[in-house]
From Swiss-Prot:
<comment type="subunit">
    <text>Heterodimer of a catalytic subunit (MsrP) and a heme-binding subunit (MsrQ).</text>
</comment>
<keyword id="KW-0732">Signal</keyword>
<feature type="binding site">
    <location>
        <position position="146"/>
    </location>
    <ligand>
        <name>Mo-molybdopterin</name>
    </ligand>
</feature>
<feature type="binding site">
    <location>
        <begin position="249"/>
        <end position="251"/>
    </location>
    <ligand>
        <name>Mo-molybdopterin</name>
    </ligand>
</feature>
<feature type="binding site">
    <location>
        <position position="233"/>
    </location>
    <ligand>
        <name>Mo-molybdopterin</name>
    </ligand>
</feature>
<feature type="binding site">
    <location>
        <begin position="91"/>
        <end position="92"/>
    </location>
    <ligand>
        <name>Mo-molybdopterin</name>
    </ligand>
</feature>
<dbReference type="InterPro" id="IPR006311">
    <property type="entry name" value="TAT_signal"/>
</dbReference>
<dbReference type="GO" id="GO:0016672">
    <property type="term" value="F:oxidoreductase activity, acting on a sulfur group of donors, quinone or similar compound as acceptor"/>
</dbReference>
<feature type="binding site">
    <location>
        <position position="88"/>
    </location>
    <ligand>
        <name>Mo-molybdopterin</name>
    </ligand>
</feature>
<dbReference type="GO" id="GO:0043546">
    <property type="term" value="F:molybdopterin cofactor binding"/>
</dbReference>
<feature type="binding site">
    <location>
        <position position="181"/>
    </location>
    <ligand>
        <name>Mo-molybdopterin</name>
    </ligand>
</feature>
<protein>
    <recommendedName>
        <fullName>Protein-methionine-sulfoxide reductase catalytic subunit MsrP</fullName>
        <ecNumber>1.8.5.-</ecNumber>
    </recommendedName>
</protein>
<feature type="signal peptide" description="Tat-type signal">
    <location>
        <begin position="1"/>
        <end position="44"/>
    </location>
</feature>
<dbReference type="GO" id="GO:0046872">
    <property type="term" value="F:metal ion binding"/>
</dbReference>
<dbReference type="InterPro" id="IPR022867">
    <property type="entry name" value="MsrP"/>
</dbReference>
<keyword id="KW-0479">Metal-binding</keyword>
<keyword id="KW-0500">Molybdenum</keyword>
Amino acid sequence: MKKNQFLKESDVTAESVFFMKRRQVLKALGISATALSLPHAAHADLLSWFKGNDRPPAPAGKALEFSKPAAWQNNLPLTPADKVSGYNNFYEFGLDKADPAANAGSLKTDPWTLKISGEVAKPLTLDHDDLTRRFPLEERIYRMRCVEAWSMVVPWIGFPLHKLLALAEPTSNAKYVAFETIYAPEQMPGQQDRFIGGGLKYPYVEGLRLDEAMHPLTLMTVGVYGKALPPQNGAPVRLIVPWKYGFKGIKSIVSIKLTRERPPTTWNLAAPDEYGFYANVNPYVDHPRWSQATERFIGSGGILDVQRQPTLLFNGYADQVASLYRGLDLRENF
């Protein structure tokens, strides 16, 4: 596998200071413009009003043992850990970027069960310890590109999904892989209340073609910055597919099911004209309401210092993954 294409130092996200454009979609789903314009403090008050204000802080992640394959290491300064953990989309905990960090401490991640089922010869069930002990862990420094046209560079820790799927032995009927987030409305206020969760249908679901899932880049991620994932980043296990937009990176996974037919995916169900099944990073295919030709790397000085640079096809991983889509019209299959 080829080594990562190097980024400039200015490419690394340093601060969370820009606006959510998907709010227009949420308004179409019935969430009021007034609610969407509320500042974070007001969102916090609303969460308290719906759920009470005694939310525990997220526990500190434990240190993990992992290797650092040379192909995925470089000397770039990384997005600061507090920005990666403090600036998230995880609508189960609220719409504001700061809501997941503020509210995800209520998520219980141990014990945990992850089931692999469907078109497999050997269905599997993994517990919390299996996620960090059954497979050798490695750190991979990946670009992360949000569909909202911002990006980060993050040192994820995990294991290739293909290793897990190989244990389950997909049958010849398996063509797709369906993923599902935990459904726990008593712990996730956005699942309990349509207002808080943006009107999406829960549990959150995602999917990949089997060949995408089996690609060496596709990572079952259990840690970041040397420690177990914090709840707001998708603990205890999430998906990272670095050549796709971030909403494909489903968090807090409890089910992986291999299927014959293409599975439904949450954002495609919510707005099929805006969020496709493939969701490959592509500067030549714009979102209906904004350009994807460039992306924002957010500097420490605030929104006026945000630097914009060209978006890379497949988020810079074209050499590794373009062959998966040979002959596929990427405009029609966005």
